[in-house]
Amino acid sequence: MPPKAHAWVGPSSIARVLACPPSARFSEQFPDTESDFAAEGTEAHELCEYLVRKALGEKVRNPKKKLKFYNAEMQECAEGYAAYIMELYETAKQNCTTTEIMLEQRVDVSEYIPECFGTADCIIVADGTMTISDYKHGMGIKVEATDNPQLKTYALGTLAMFDFLYDINTVRLIIYQPRLENVDEW
């Protein structure tokens, strides 16, 4: 997992800021607290990252022992995500030998939005196509990829990082939300 850092405004809060711009500065006065639901989601992301890195052949440490919220459902969700990401990656590699995959990648968008950065769950870049996938562990609200401000913000930053290396003409945005059986692509 990347170091815990928070932007003044990040991709995960961009929808709120677009709807109410003053909320960006207003929210600074409140402590940055994490609910149990958010902590569970963070741990699910750690497990997802571990399983994808393991599938890629990287030497990684299994995080299960330190996960407070780990259970069979989290394992099943993370395994499904890892299989899905590996399928996307293998398909991209068939079309481009220089395909890049990045997990928990810091994306800087400050060229367009001051002090804006965030961490994208998975970015796959191949000639012609860039795919950004976001894992959602929550089951309270179904998240859609279509016109998703968070994913579009990651796309903006990722294009700035890779457009000079790859001739990107297609951007795929994907939400993977297994507990609601939701895999949505735009």
Protein language model regions, located:
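Nuclease catalytic cores
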Residues: H6-L56
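Residue-level detector of alpha-helix boundaries and kinks
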Residues: Q29-T33, Y70, M139
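Broad hydrophobic/π-residue packing in well-ordered secondary structure
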Residues: V17-L18, P22-R25, L51, I85-L88, ...
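Glycine- and charge-rich intrinsically disordered segments
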Residues: M1-P3
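A non-catalytic, helix-rich entry segment at domain boundaries
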Residues: E34-S35, A39, E43-Q105, S110
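Mg2+/Mn2+-dependent nuclease catalytic core
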Residues: T97-W186
